[in-house]
């Protein structure tokens, strides 16, 4: 995981809270590049310590070969390709994106542009694929997605790129920080939000409630996310291994605020 990222930090706080409540201590290991040997080496080091279980908050596109565990080691993973192999807890990415895009279409926008998260993030890839699929199912044009990462600076650059196009009236950003950067760029370029352009984020960070205008977003329950993963590990520690297909999907919630409105006629 990368603790400086807001989502991972909030999920980690949930892990710490749940583990502490169960009278467990937590060792944190930050892995810069999960798809490289960094994750394998981190797991190797941890597995040779006296640990009772492993929670992988974020592993991106890491393959199963990167997570080599001792037999019967309790483990829980999240939002990565590893969810196909190990017990997992993840936000309802698909439902959240459908809510966001559907909200913009219901307001009357002809289509919805998208600013992506990073290519090495499974969550980002799911959000992009679901955005495109939702538009196709509604019979709408699927615009070229704008590449980005999780940072506000990338959203700002995307906003500068999209602002000159008067056909851009609605944008779904892969996270709130991208959305906040994009809104600033739109304002600087004379595009009013939401009068000229509606913007929706994803995550439900507290700062979005105090942006101008307040950000419409899809809220994830990061604390519950951390709690569920700890519960999966504790269940395995008490009762033995769980089926790798065991998956907990945590609902998301669309928070409609001031950054979305019907398109100006």
What residues fall within each predicted segment?
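Flexible loop/turn connectors
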Residues: 142, 164-265
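Conserved hydrophobic residues forming the short capping helix/wall of the S-adenosyl-L-methionine
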Residues: 19, 134-135, 186, 237
């Amino acid at each position: 995981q990368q603790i400086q990222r807001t989502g991972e930090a909030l999920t980690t706080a949930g892990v710490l809270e749940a583990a502490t409540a169960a009278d467990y201590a937590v060792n944190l290991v930050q892995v810069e590049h999960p798809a490289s040997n960094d994750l394998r080496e981190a797991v190797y080091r941890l597995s040779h310590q006296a640990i009772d279980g492993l929670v992988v908050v974020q592993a991106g596109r890491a393959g199963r070969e990167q997570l080599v565990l001792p037999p019967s080691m309790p483990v829980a993973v999240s939002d990565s390709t590893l969810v196909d192999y190990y017990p997992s807890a993840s936000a309802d990415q698909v439902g959240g994106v459908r809510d966001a895009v559907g909200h913009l279409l219901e307001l009357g926008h002809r289509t919805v542009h998208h600013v992506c998260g990073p290519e090495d993030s499974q969550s980002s890839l799911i959000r992009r694929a679901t955005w495109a699929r939702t538009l196709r199912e509604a019979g709408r044009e699927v615009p070229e997605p704008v590449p980005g990462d999780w940072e506000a600076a990338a959203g700002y650059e995307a906003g500068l790129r999209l602002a000159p196009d008067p056909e851009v009236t609605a944008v779904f950003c892969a996270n709130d920080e991208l959305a906040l950067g994009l809104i600033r760029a739109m304002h600087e370029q004379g595009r009013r939000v939401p009068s000229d352009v509606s913007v929706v984020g994803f995550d439900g960070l507290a700062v979005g409630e105090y942006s101008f205008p307040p950000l419409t977003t899809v809220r994830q329950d990061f604390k519950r996310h951390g709690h569920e993963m700890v519960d999966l590990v504790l269940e395995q520690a008490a009762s033995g291994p769980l089926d790798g297909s065991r998956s907990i999907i945590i609902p998301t919630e669309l928070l409609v605020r001031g950054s979305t409105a019907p398109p100006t006629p």
